[in-house]
């Protein structure tokens, strides 16, 4: 094709002719059989392509280079006879006379730091009983998400996890762990089972480039939003990153253990950008997979130097094939899309349709961040809040409107929200309760499309935010009764709202990062889950636990019915109090005929009128488990504690 400038490449890639002549719908990557392995690589602009063979995934010489044969649609392939399980390889792809050695972008395993790809018999990586592993059945009423980083989960020495497994996939498989091994205070998987969350959302577990797997991890840390290989797990989370099959097997063992505990696994996927410009996709088809400005330079809507061109046919195929692979091979239960606003609506809906076609695929969750990290050259409908009505009803969005209404803006540490007493914010809290289905702030949507939350890995933890609002110089490790009450109030609001409830791991035990608002590469010590705080703040943990169970006992809050929020009846109360009632849906198995809920963000007790009838106190400002016993019933009026969410059930 001759030497081309980036601008010329852009014109070529966006031409109908290129799409027509190069779009390929078949399998790519390694296809293993005991008799031999076929490698297939899509590289339509390449003049030559060859495979380089290695015995090891690092520090070993090339033992041979073989040419690939070009076929239709620009697919290059080669048949390697014999059992190739455990063998490593790279490609050398020549474009415009420049030869680049690269890993296989379609590889399913790799060596140290993912620099070399690996051929695997995937059946040999499956743990015992894997063929019987199935996705837990989690009805909408029980859906809730607990977000955690693999390292954070268990790297605390007090976690009770065996030292070799701390910060690893295998930490999720160890049962019966307790704080310092005391046999009393549960940690890790033991803790999760007791907490009662429906899903664990794992921050990036695919192979990323910001941690060197060849070096000790003692001082290394990164969240992992730096993809290098999309289709196999990160090696630093395995017990042996040099052996490519180990990370695959141990990741499956983690998922199997969570499934056995009745917990679904949601994977945080970051297709929107790659770690560096020199990457497996760009080395194979320069500039094709990344959105370009008119002059051919890279668009940077991710804020990371590049952004994925989801609208280009083979980029869309790459992303959807990857999702399907994780869902099928690893039994993933859901996907959280980082910077989902960088994908076009058509790609997201096509991904939903592809997952739906799998056995049980309609139960796989999809939701993401409906924003971008900068200006983008995406000139199609973006998968953002403004286009929510164009997305499939089973694609959700993180709702920053809910987050900011409850706890205050995330970019100003001292800006209060409703829980901290911000004047006028009660209007937005009403919108949040209804999942914004009764507001013109968002296009028409189902309540289940709204991810209701107040904290995630980005920005301040809820505890740190509450203290920053209250104090000019907070003492983050000190206990604070008012902040604790405000924490309970914040949880009480989003856990009694329509939508999908979501919390950052440790929010329920006042997790602190000591005021660090972006800890993506801070120390392991700062980022770890401090399991001693789960003991210290056990009453707060129990408050979350009780609300999660209470929510499950009133299924209408988790409904997918877009008309359900219309049944909410809001009360006329003295500002800034908020109160509402919601009847149970007929035949949904609710424990109570209706819920009546009040929020009081003030520092004084308040008396409020109750609707007609008898109302059992289910949860007040300190205990969310009153409904489990013979709690008091009320008629006509009730007293609200300061900084409280109070829940009644009609009896």
Annotated model-derived regions:
Residues 64-70, 218-219, 224-225, 339-444, ...:
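Active-site-proximal helices and loops of the catalytic beta/alpha 8
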Residues 41, 91, 148, 202, ...:
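Conserved, mostly hydrophobic/aromatic
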Residues 1-34, 70-174:
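The feature marks proteins involved in alpha-glucan
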Residues 444-616:
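Loop/helix patches that line or flank the sugar-binding groove of alpha-linked glycan CAZymes
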Residues 151-330, 336-359, 365, 376-377:
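Substrate-binding/active-site clefts of carbohydrate-active enzymes
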Residues 43, 86-87, 630-651:
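C-terminal beta-strand-rich structural cap/linker in extracellular carbohydrate-active enzymes
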Residues 109-158, 397, 401-479:
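Glycine-rich phosphate/pyrophosphate-binding loop
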Residues 35-39:
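Structural beta-strand segments of beta-rich domains
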């Amino acid at each position: 094709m001759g030497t081309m400038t980036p601008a010329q490449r852009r014109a070529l890639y966006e031409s109908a002719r290129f799409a027509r002549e190069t779009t390929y719908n078949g399998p790519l990557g390694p296809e293993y059989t005991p008799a031999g392995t076929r490698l297939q690589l899509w590289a339509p602009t390449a003049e030559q392509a060859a495979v380089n063979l290695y015995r090891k995934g690092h520090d070993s010489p090339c033992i041979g280079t073989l040419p690939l044969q070009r076929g239709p649609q620009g697919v290059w392939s080669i048949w390697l006879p014999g059992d190739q399980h455990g063998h490593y390889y790279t490609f050398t792809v020549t474009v415009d006379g420049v030869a680049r050695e690269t890993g296989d972008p379609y590889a399913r395993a790799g060596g140290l730091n993912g620099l070399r790809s690996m051929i695997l018999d995937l059946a040999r990586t499956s743990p015992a009983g894997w063929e019987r592993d199935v996705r837990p059945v989690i009805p909408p009423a029980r859906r809730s998400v607990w977000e955690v980083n693999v390292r954070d989960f268990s790297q605390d020495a007090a976690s009770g996890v065996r030292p070799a497994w701390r910060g690893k996939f295998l930490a999720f498989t160890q049962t019966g762990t307790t704080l310092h091994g005391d046999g009393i205070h549960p940690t890790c998987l033991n803790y999760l089972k007791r907490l009662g969350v429906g899903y664990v959302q794992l921050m990036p577990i695919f192979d990323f480039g910001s941690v060197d797997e060849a070096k000790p991890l003692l001082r290394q840390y990164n969240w992992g939003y730096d993809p290098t290989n999309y289709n196999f797990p990160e090696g630093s989370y395995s017990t042996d990153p040099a052996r490519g099959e180990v990370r695959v097997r141990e990741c499956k063992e983690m998922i199997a253990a969570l499934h056995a505990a009745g917990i679904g696994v949601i994977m945080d996927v970051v297709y929107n950008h790659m770690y560096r410009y020199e990457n497996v996709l760009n080395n194979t088809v320069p500039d094709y997979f990344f959105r370009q400005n008119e002059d051919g330079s890279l668009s940077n809507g991710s804020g990371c130097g590049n952004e994925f061109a989801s609208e280009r046919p083979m980029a869309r195929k790459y992303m959807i094939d990857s999702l399907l692979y994780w869902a099928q091979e690893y039994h993933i239960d859901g996907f959280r899309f980082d910077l989902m606003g960088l994908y076009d609506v058509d790609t997201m809906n096509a991904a939903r349709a592809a997952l739906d076609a799998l056995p049980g695929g309609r139960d796989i969750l999809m939701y993401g961040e409906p924003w971008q990290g900068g200006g983008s050259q995406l000139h199609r409908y973006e998968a953002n809040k403004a286009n929510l009505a164009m997305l499939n009803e089973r694609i959700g969005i993180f709702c920053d409107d809910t987050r900011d209404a409850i706890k205050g803006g995330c970019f100003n540490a001292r800006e209060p929200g409703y829980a901290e007493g911000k004047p006028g914010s009660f209007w937005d809290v009403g919108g949040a309760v209804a999942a914004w289905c009764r507001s013109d702030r968002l296009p028409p949507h189902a309540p289940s499309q709204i991810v209701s939350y107040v904290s995630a890995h980005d920005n301040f933890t809820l505890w740190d935010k509450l203290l920053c609002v209250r104090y000019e110089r907070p003492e983050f490790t000190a206990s604070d009764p008012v902040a604790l009450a405000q924490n309970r109030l914040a949880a009480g609001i989003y856990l009694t709202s329509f939508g999908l409830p979501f919390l950052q791991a440790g929010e329920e035990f006042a997790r602190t990062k000591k005021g660090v608002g972006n800890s993506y590469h801070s120390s392991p010590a700062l980022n770890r889950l401090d399991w001693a705080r789960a003991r210290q703040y056990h009453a707060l943990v129990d408050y979350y636990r009780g609300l999660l169970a209470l929510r499950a006992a009133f299924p209408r809050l988790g409904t997918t019915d877009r008309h359900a929020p219309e049944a909410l009846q809001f009360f006329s109360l003295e500002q800034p109090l908020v109160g509402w009632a919601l009847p149970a849906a007929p035949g949904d198995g609710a424990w109570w005929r209706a819920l009546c809920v009040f929020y009081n963000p003030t520092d004084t007790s308040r008396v409020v009128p109750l609707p007609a009838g008898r109302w059992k106190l289910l949860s007040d400002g300190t205990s969310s488990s009153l409904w489990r016993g013979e709690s008091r019933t009320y008629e006509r009026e009730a007293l609200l504690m300061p900084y409280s969410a109070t829940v009644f059930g009609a009896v």
